[in-house]
Amino acid sequence: MAEVELSIVMPCLNEERTLKKCIKDAQSFLRRKNISGEIIVVDNGSTDNSSKIAKQCGARVVKEARKGYGRALRTGFEAACGEYIIMGDCDCTYDFAHMTKMWRLMQSCDMVVGDRFKANLEPGAMSLSHRIGVRALSWLARRRFHSKVYDYHCGIRGMRRAAIEKLEFRTTGMEFATEMIALAELKGLKIKQLPVDYRKSVKGRRPKLNTIRDGFRHLDYILVGAMKPFWRDFWRLTGILLTSVLAGLGLLWLVAQIPREDLKENTQKSVDYYLNYDSGEMKPYLTSDYEILGKNLYGTMMDFYADSIWLSIAYSYDGSLRSVIESKYANVKEDSMGENLQKQLNGELEANEEYSRYWHGSLVIVRPLLKWFSVQQIYIIYGVVITGLLLAIILSLCKHREFVAAGAFAVAAIVAGAPLAAICLEYAQVFVVLGMVSLIAMRLVWRDKTKALPYLFFCSGILVNYLDFLTAETLTLAIPLLLALWLMRKQKLEMGGFKFVLKIMLFWALGYVLMWLAKWLIAWLALGGSAWQSVGAQIEKRSVSTEGGFNHFEMLGYAVDMNFSSLFPICFGSWAGLITAIVVCGLLLLAAKFPKKQLDWLWVSTVLIVSCVPLLRMLVLLEHEVRHFFFTYRALMALVLGFLFVIIRVVDWQRVKSCLKCKNRA
């Protein structure tokens, strides 16, 4: 077999309408120039007849199931045998039949990059937004990487194999085009440019390029992607945090422009509901007349006290940014919060107590809803949203044949009373964030984009701090991370994977803490030192306070007892608790007697560490866990889900099944 001189690599995703012409044109070029070459079509997950057509035309097909322009090209480069490589899109926008000039230039440099703007750019071949974006990003890249390349995004290029082997590619998407030139400049490779025609593709072809999404990926690489990992993460996180703080404050100011009068009718209906139900304080939503089931199911507590504060703050907004940061509510200690809210509506009491350490982000949702709905109706809306998100997680798992995980998640959600979280504005926010982050995390794992998980969890920490009332915020870390770990279980978790999980947890914690610090800092700058003193007092109160004369060990005992006894079905009484204990012990005995012989213990240990996050929270916020056990117990959903995942993975169910069959025969 003759030595291959030139490899022509074409990334392909559903290009059955254009692929044949591109291959034939490339073959024509190789014949005319008498070049010993090969044509490689990298099938990037096509669902049409692209692969079949490529084989029929004599091209070599290489499969790359992981989606991404960069992934496809990197796979094609690895498969190529030629001393020289030309890459080009197989959508008929580039002319493979006339590459003589490129071939000639390749003999005297390391890389040849096409320039579509100095040749024939066919009308309609490039949209106006695409044209502006390419020029702007290319201009920015030239200055960032000290380059003379004019068109950073041209899809047809030629290079020596030796030059490619010097470049350490990391990117997988469209930003690969920018990375290739940036790395070449960094390595000091000799780059030449060549004007190339750019034509319209066939009519009706769906473009693969998304101007906003892919433009942002190019911009991200230009600004921070080429940096060392630490600085890359630092600037990305800084950008996300600053954007989030400004957007969050801006949205609150925007909803503060809704006139109070527009909220008065539905706020009054809400107050009537609170006062008629239980004097505007707290009461379990579900009760029982049967002693064996327990008279009060505290896991269903409706915290009207907190919700009345919420509505009072919403009503106190006067359109100014200061009112947003102060987050004042009406409070006279002799009256219930429902009665205080009624007096505020009647004009008998002004909002007089600051809650600036939070400036409640969830009012971005609740305040506009109050314009059209009463609080009872808002509870229903939240119920539909939360139930929909929980079902979406279960159905997504089932769609990917993860039935066991779907069942475990459903059990954990029921045990922690997740479907009932919507009965109180205070609790609902966590489960909305949990649902959204879980769905995105699972999608990233399924699409093999796990590198984005740390940034997702950083955003999760920011968002839950912005929206939540310190209820069960760790669920937005633990549940999505446990689901991601389950989906990644088939890949043996090496130490690098364990460190990656720790990085995810660190990023979530950073997002949460930094958002809170940003809130406090803004409150301090706007309101003065009193805001910061309030923060310090609340931290001490919720963590190390031992009100009632109890020591820390007694408080810990109360926290454990009250939180665990609020879980379903333990909350139904001692008999239910005993049955639950028997089931748990039975599962542990199964794991001890029928363990799998080959087991990824690092994966198991990692799941257990993530599962214990709510217990760590209990130790840190001890007084808070005792005082507010009726909602903090929901954080234990992570412990339940992690326990079920570990049991499912550790137990050798085939051995259990065989043992049961033997006993039945006997």
Describe each PLM feature range.
Residues 5-7, 38:
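Cell-envelope/extracellular polymer assembly enzymes that use nucleotide-activated donors
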Residues 25-35:
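Short, acidic, metal-binding catalytic loop of nucleotide-sugar glycosyltransferases
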Residues 35-40, 51-79:
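Conserved donor nucleotide-binding strand/loop of the catalytic core
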Residues 43-51, 92:
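A conserved acidic beta->alpha catalytic loop
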Residues 65-79, 84, 96-174, 201-219:
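Acceptor/aglycone-binding surface of glycosyltransferases and processive sugar-polymer synthases
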Residues 390-393, 573-601:
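Hydrophobic, aromatic-rich transmembrane alpha-helices
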Residues 408-410, 598-622:
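Transmembrane alpha-helix segments characteristic
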Residues 501-585:
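Membrane-lumen/periplasm interface segments of specific transmembrane helices
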